[in-house]
Amino acid sequence: MRVVTQNAVTCFQNGGNGTFSNTRVVTENGISKMYLFGNLIATLEHKVGGVMKITNAGWESNTTRERLNGLPNVHIRQVRGEWFLNGQKWNGQLTEV
């Protein structure tokens, strides 16, 4: 895992705010949001038992996949151009994990 991903994920999980290269974490009202190049890719509702949702925001890039894979309970891989989330084909739409 890249250092920028590790730092962003730690901030995201701890409910912090920060910018890490092309990744920004903003926390307001108990909800952390992770942005990559200005696109929302993950949310974490700290007050609701840690409900986390992810999306690729329409970008099937290596960087998007790498940032999302840094999150707990997220394993994304690409096979023949198709993305799989935790072993299931995934279209990149907002999904609770």
Predicted feature descriptions by range:
Residues 1-97:
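Terminal leader/tail segments of proteins
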